[in-house]
Amino acid sequence: MEQVNELKEKGNKALSAGNIDDALQCYSEAIKLDPQNHVLYSNRSAAYAKKGDYQKAYEDGCKTVDLKPDWGKGYSRKAAALEFLNRFEEAKQTYEEGLKHEANNPQLKEGLQNMEARLAERKFMNPFNMPNLYQKLESDPRTKTLLADPTYRELIEQLRNKPSDLGTKLQDPRIMTTLSVLLGVDLGSMDEEEEVATPPPPPPPKKETKPEPMEEDLPENKKQALREKELGNEAYKKKDFDTALKHYDKAKDLDPTNMTYITNQAAVYFEKGDYGQCRELCEKAIEVGRENREDYRQIAKAYARIGNSYFKEEKYKDAIHFYNKSLAEHRTPDVLKKCQQAEKILKEQERLAYINPDLALEEKNKGNECFQKGDYPQAMKHYTEAIKRNPKDAKLYSNRAACYTKLLEFQLALKDCEECIQLEPTFIKGYTRKAAALEAMKDYTKAMDVYQKALDLDSNCKEAADGYQRCVMAQYNRHDSPEDVKRRAMADPEVQQIMSDPAMRLILEQMQKDPQALSEHLKNPVIAQKIQKLMDVGLIAIR
């Protein structure tokens, strides 16, 4: 086991120094000695990814997940490899699977957000550039009539030449119709799972269903039941709940197969604040509805009302359960929004209930012990648990940042340092650990800035002074060739993602041909951020 740890540490140092082949050899030798060690496969996956051998990185990521299915890092490795292989949908699914095991893993959360953004970009690539554009518009009756309007043609040409204007034109119903034709989808139904309600699409052609019976076709008992229901509705609107209940009760007796009269009674008890009786009636209504093959939308309403009753009582777990039952019957934006609201409240309640500074201290001490032994993955787990128990303790983020740095996860180390500094701006370790991570990434300019901030707080801080001096010397002795700059930059996953984005490649080519285009692109904050990143790593320069 000692030999395995030595090989692993040797591999980590080689990978940090950019000696990828040496790192791969060390990890492979360690795996031969300990083939069930998931951390070794995870590290080798990272090395293969840096080398550009994404298929092998993916295979090692899969092996990591197989050996340790509850470890978020394994899913992160596997998903990252899938990203590089341009298998975005699979990458998204892998991030989602990882979050089932580690719901608060920041790397998985960020990865999932990036994948959703990438998939959204793919989904809405400029369709106005297709070669047979007008032929397609002519062949569809929805757009054929629009082509007679010169302003419509002008609009199409504008979007063809400047697709960035599409976002400002989506309010125009002609554009939504055009997109439906060009993309071959009904955009009215695409947002079914969005939180916010959207205007419903045009009704589809009616199916051959039995027509709703008119009152004159109904049996006498059903007619009387409807009249009682109307009287009940009038009383309900006037807040005369006792009278409303009497009429709904008569309607139910006249037509016992109709669940609506029972759900109306439940609505009255809901307004009266008798939530137990409301739920009992809703359950009874669902039973009657099932027996008589009632419309699933009515069943969904009954479940939603049960959910609302629990929400009123602040029993959010029960509310979520019944909201989901309602959504399984029939999905509506209002119920979805209410369910998400309950989930958000419950999550916050659970987070606050979990806070315990004494247990946080215990976990911190366990983390310190593991860190001293060199078991950084286990130390990180203890620090993460400590943070959940006491999220306002800046030192915990600093300790976890030290773990991330040891595990070569410099971006995550930087995030924890930022959180540490935000919580306690005068805590020196937050600055020195952030600077150390930047130094390890060979970003000497930024590292010097952070070391200087530490010295501003404490001019006698030897760690900051030594670090600053190291960065000055490293910067002075640096004679990187363009190839070295590119190799180091491409080892950064964020840079890899930017450079593999077809849209960004197009923008960079356009900037080379037409430098004036830069100012236009910089108006988009997302693109500006990506360009700034490429400038920071030295891949591009603007004069």
UniProtKB/Swiss-Prot annotation:
Modified residues (Phosphothreonine): T198, T332
UniProt TPR repeat ranges: 4-37, 39-71, 73-105, 225-258, 260-292, 300-333, 360-393, 395-427, 428-461
Position of sequence motif Bipartite nuclear localization signal: 222-239
Described purpose of this protein according to its UniProt entry: Acts as a co-chaperone for HSP90AA1. Mediates the association of the molecular chaperones HSPA8/HSC70 and HSP90.
A GO term from the CC aspect: dynein axonemal particle
Superkingdom to which the source organism belongs: Eukaryota
Domain notes: The TPR 1 repeat interacts with the C-terminal of HSC70. The TPR 4, 5 and 6 repeats (also called TPR2A domain) and TPR 7, 8 and 9 repeats (also called TPR2B domain) interact with HSP90.
Pfam families: STI1-HOP_DP, TPR_11, TPR_12, TPR_8
Record PTM Phosphotyrosine, positions in chain: Y354
Subcellular location: Cytoplasm; Nucleus; Dynein axonemal particle
Taxonomic source organism: Bos taurus
Signal peptide: none
Primary gene name: STIP1
Name by which UniProt lists this protein: Stress-induced-phosphoprotein 1
